[in-house]
């Protein structure tokens, strides 16, 4: 059971870190494309394959071209609000929810609750102000 808790905790932490890592060379046309790229990179580990499948661009400049405004550094309040509207819980906690449906153990239920609370914390007004001021 402790092994499952560790795996689930690492999965949650990795999903959040993948969305917050500094990677200014990848520009994506939407938040959905950015999320897909990050998930692909985490699962597959091949940046070129993930770029090709997500419609993102790998650029050498520090500014994304027109139409590709969702670079990783664009974590302003508007981007956080849009991410929260699209469903932080469904995108970040989706794998845990599937696991919960197949194995409704106390540990999995607790991890789903922690993931949901993490999304709630990120999506509150106070957290958005902190991101805007950072």
From Swiss-Prot:
It holds the Pfam family Thionin. Its main location: secreted. Keywords: Disulfide bond, Plant defense, Secreted, Signal, Toxin. Transmembrane segments: none annotated. Residues 1-24 form the signal peptide. GO terms for molecular function: toxin activity. It comes from the Eukaryota. Residues 71-134 form a propeptide. It is found in: Secreted. Disulfide bonds join 27-64, 28-56, 40-50. SUPFAM superfamilies: Crambin-like. One of its GO terms (biological process) is defense response. Belongs to the plant thionin (TC 1.C.44) family. Thionins are small plant proteins which are toxic to animal cells. They seem to exert their toxic effect at the level of the cell membrane. Their precise function is not known. This is Probable thionin-2.4.
């Amino acid at each position: 059971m402790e092994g499952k808790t560790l795996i689930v905790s690492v999965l949650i932490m990795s999903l959040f870190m993948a969305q917050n890592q500094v990677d200014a060379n990848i520009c994506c046309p939407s938040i959905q494309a950015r999320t897909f790229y990050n998930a692909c990179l985490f699962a597959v580990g091949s940046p070129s394959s993930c770029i090709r499948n997500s419609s993102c661009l790998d650029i050498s400049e520090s500014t994304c071209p027109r139409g590709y405004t969702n670079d990783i550094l664009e974590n302003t309040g508007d981007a956080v609000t849009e991410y929260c509207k699209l469903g932080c819980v469904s995108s970040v906690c989706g794998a845990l929810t599937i696991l919960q449906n197949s194995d409704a153990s106390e540990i999995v239920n607790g991890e789903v609750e922690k993931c949901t609370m993490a999304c709630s914390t990120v999506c509150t007004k106070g957290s958005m102000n902190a991101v805007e001021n950072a």
